[in-house]
Structures are given as C-alpha cells and as structure tokens.
C-alpha cells in the first residue's frame, strides 16, 4: 500500500506541470495592472493634513469658478475632533462631521457674518457652504501628497491635496 502511494506521489508533480498552459502572448507571464487603491479614511487621517482645494467640477465636468477666487489662497479644509473648518473664504465657516463607511456626514454649517468687500468672496462663502452639507461620498488616497475627493449629493466633485 505504501509503495503504491509513493508511486502516485511521484507522478503528481509531472501531472501538474503538464496541465500548465502557455500564455497566448508568446510565453510571457501576464502582469496585472498597477491600480492605486483607496486607503481607509478615518477622522485621524484627515486631521493630519490641511486640505487645499485643487480642483472642483460640477456634474457636467465644468470647473466651479466660484470656488477659486484667490489663486494664492485656495479654499482649505481642516478636520479636528469632529469639527470641520473652512479657511481662506471671507468668513469663518465650520460645522460638525463624522465618517460612516465611505460617507462624510456634515452637520449644519455656521459662519461669521462679516461683510466682504469683494462680492466674489461672498459668493465663495455661499458656494463652499452649499457643497459641504449632508452626506458626501469620500475618497481618500494616501499617495504623496495625500488626496481627498468629495462627491456632493448634487453631483459636484471637490478634489483636495493634503499639506
């Protein structure tokens, strides 16, 4: 019985080798494409950076110019201890937030009420406040530099770079 088992075990590697097929691309082993995977996002990973707006597009893919009033001071988001702060607008804007799976849930935003000398800054306050409300889909990439993408309920996409 042991001899028969030993004989069968000797044939097993040969059978496995014979069953392997040669790739149809001339014998080269196919390589899987390298795909960047999104990192798990949590409040701690958001709090380690200042998030500067790099790109903003509406649902049709058009740039949202109202969010780019100051080229030298892009809109910035800071996350800290359940609070979201919007910087580089006319007024100070903030609210609560929490993360649930792939959603950033933003509470009611509050703002100071300073008069803005530049109407474009007033529009910036309104434009960013309208987009940072409710449930936003959140995507986080731990690349260098890290990237944050928010997709609003209205279909707008806001892309930030972490500094």
Task: Describe each PLM feature range.
Residues 7-17:
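Bacterial N-terminal signal peptides
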């Amino acid at each position: 019985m042991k001899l028969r088992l030993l004989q069968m075990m000797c044939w097993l590697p040969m059978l496995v080798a014979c069953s392997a097929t040669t790739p149809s691309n001339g014998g080269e082993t196919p390589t899987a494409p390298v795909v960047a995977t999104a990192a798990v996002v949590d409040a701690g990973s958001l709090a380690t950076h200042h998030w500067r707006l790099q790109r903003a597009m509406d649902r049709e893919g058009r740039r949202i110019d109202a969010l780019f009033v100051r080229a030298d001071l892009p809109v910035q988001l800071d996350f800290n201890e359940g609070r979201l702060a919007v910087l580089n607008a006319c007024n100070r804007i903030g609210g609560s937030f929490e993360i649930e799976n792939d959603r950033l849930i933003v509470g009611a935003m509050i703002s100071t009420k300073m008069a803005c000398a530049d109407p474009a800054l007033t529009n910036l306050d309104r434009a960013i406040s309208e987009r940072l409300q409710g449930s936003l889909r959140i995507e986080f990439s731990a690349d260098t530099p890290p990237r944050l993408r928010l997709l609003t309920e209205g279909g707008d996409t806001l892309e930030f770079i972490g500094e």
